């Protein structure tokens, strides 16, 4: 059986086109209980697998001179609503989120990150993560 290095092909194509950054990897956990909008863009529902594969992908990109943008901080796996069309609202406790969806973002580092356009009611009830100073500051201070 022939194995194809898809990651390598993408890196070569990006470099050929003069692109030096890619919005990967998706660190969101797959949640089979939801009609998860992240779907197969997630590596797994298991955070250890997501962390391991994400670190490998980031290392490969950096070794090739490309930068990565981890996404969707602090996590998009716990909602079934596509944030491109409506504002998802999550009512889960901060403790639950820290031990599940937010966990991968604490273990994987990248210079750049894309926030999740989600309202986490138990963290900041008035602003979605993209606009929440509290959530962004918490991420910067490694509270997630």
Model segments located where?
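Enzymes and membrane/adaptor proteins characterized by extended Gly/Ser/Thr/Asp/Glu-rich
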Residues: 1-49, 78-90, 116-129
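Second-shell residues forming the walls of enzyme active-site clefts
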Residues: 49-144
């Amino acid at each position: 059986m022939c194995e194809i290095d898809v990651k390598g092909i993408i890196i070569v194509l990006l470099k050929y086109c003069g692109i030096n950054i890619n919005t990967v990897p998706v660190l969101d956990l797959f949640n089979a209980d939801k009609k998860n909008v992240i779907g197969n863009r997630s590596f797994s529902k298991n955070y250890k697998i997501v962390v391991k594969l994400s670190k490998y992908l980031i290392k490969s990109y950096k070794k090739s001179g490309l930068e990565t943008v981890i996404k969707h901080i602090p996590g998009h796996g716990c909602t079934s609503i596509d944030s491109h069309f409506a504002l998802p609202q999550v009512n889960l406790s901060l403790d639950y989120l820290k031990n599940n969806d937010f966990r991968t973002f604490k273990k994987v580092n990248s210079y750049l990150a894309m926030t999740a356009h989600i309202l986490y009611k138990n963290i900041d009830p008035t602003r979605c993560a993209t606009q929440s100073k509290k959530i962004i500051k918490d991420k910067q201070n490694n509270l997630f």
